[in-house]
């Protein structure tokens, strides 16, 4: 995915405010052996790009003043209540160095699983992304989680899924194996009141009939 930017010569709070007022977004590019570079981008183009899933988990071609470089989106700040991108950070990547990146999970085949079709189970997505490590060329836009064989009362764990070639999970604890999704039967609804007639309540002051001796 291509991103167009221009080098920014003026910095500071006032300069950034004027930049935003002119329809631009300030940003920075850092990493590798090159010095950090402050940039500016067209706000509307950036705003729409941020709505695309691939923009967050892919290697991007950042073109600055006509020169392209490979980068990852590392951070961005939004206005608290306006649809306004305040700032964005990109990190340069090297083709020979592995990157750590959080990639989205795409869940498939839930509707065709026996747990859902035959037992009426409900599938819950516990996680929506995973952190992986790989070379930039191997970075997937997403990781697929196949739910076809999920069983009621059980879950699909991170180590259960097949990752693309060259991609490994980043687990911060060796024994870590988080649940990605599980299947459960919904709780039975409370029983509805029966329609059987009930005896009328006794009138105030009325005595209950006595048994005959």
Swiss-Prot record:
InterPro entries referenced in this protein's UniProt entry, alphabetically: Rbsml_bL25/Gln-tRNA_synth_N (IPR020056), Ribosomal_bL25/Gln-tRNA_synth (IPR011035), Ribosomal_bL25_b-dom (IPR020057), Ribosomal_bL25_C (IPR037121), Ribosomal_bL25_long (IPR001021), Ribosomal_bL25_short (IPR020055), Ribosomal_L25_dom (IPR029751), Ribosomal_uL5_bac-type (IPR020930)
Pfam families in UniProt: Ribosomal_L25p, Ribosomal_TL5_C
Gene Ontology MF terms: 5S rRNA binding; structural constituent of ribosome
Start and end residues of each stretch annotated as Disordered: 191-213
Keywords, alphabetical: Ribonucleoprotein, Ribosomal protein, RNA-binding, rRNA-binding
One cellular component (GO) term of this entry: cytosolic large ribosomal subunit
Chain intervals with Low complexity compositional bias: 191-207
GO biological process per UniProt: translation
NCBIfam families xref list: bL25_bact_ctc (TIGR00731), PRK05618.1-2 (NF004128), PRK05618.1-5 (NF004130), PRK05943.1 (NF004612)
Similarity comment text for this entry: Belongs to the bacterial ribosomal protein bL25 family. CTC subfamily.
Oligomer status and interactors: Part of the 50S ribosomal subunit; part of the 5S rRNA/L5/L18/L25 subcomplex. Contacts the 5S rRNA. Binds to the 5S rRNA independently of L5 and L18.
The protein's role, per its UniProt record: This is one of the proteins that binds to the 5S RNA in the ribosome where it forms part of the central protuberance.
Protein's name in the database: Large ribosomal subunit protein bL25
Species whose genome carries this gene: Polynucleobacter asymbioticus (strain DSM 18221 / CIP 109841 / QLW-P1DMWA-1)
Gene: rplY
């Amino acid at each position: 995915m291509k991103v167009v930017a221009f080098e920014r010569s003026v910095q500071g709070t006032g300069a950034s405010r004027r930049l935003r007022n002119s329809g631009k977004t300030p940003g920075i590019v850092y990493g590798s052996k090159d010095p950090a570079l402050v940039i500016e981008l067209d706000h509307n183009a950036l705003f729409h790009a941020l709505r695309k899933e691939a923009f967050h988990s892919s290697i991007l071609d950042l073109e600055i003043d006509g020169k392209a470089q490979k980068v990852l989106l590392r951070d961005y700040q939004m206005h608290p209540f306006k649809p306004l991108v305040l700032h964005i950070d990109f990190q340069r990547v090297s083709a020979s160095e592995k990157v750590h990146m959080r990639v989205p999970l795409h869940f498939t085949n839930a509707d065709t699983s026996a747990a859902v079709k035959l037992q009426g189970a409900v599938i819950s997505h516990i996680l929506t992304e995973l952190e992986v490590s790989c070379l930039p060329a191997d970075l997937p836009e997403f990781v697929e989680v196949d739910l076809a064989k999920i069983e009621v009362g059980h879950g699909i764990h991170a180590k259960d899924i097949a990752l693309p070639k060259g991609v490994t999970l980043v687990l911060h604890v060796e024994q870590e194996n988080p649940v990605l999704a599980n299947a459960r039967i919904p709780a039975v609804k409370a029983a509805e009141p029966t329609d059987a007639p009930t005896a009328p309540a006794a009138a105030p002051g009325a005595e209950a009939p006595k048994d005959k001796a």
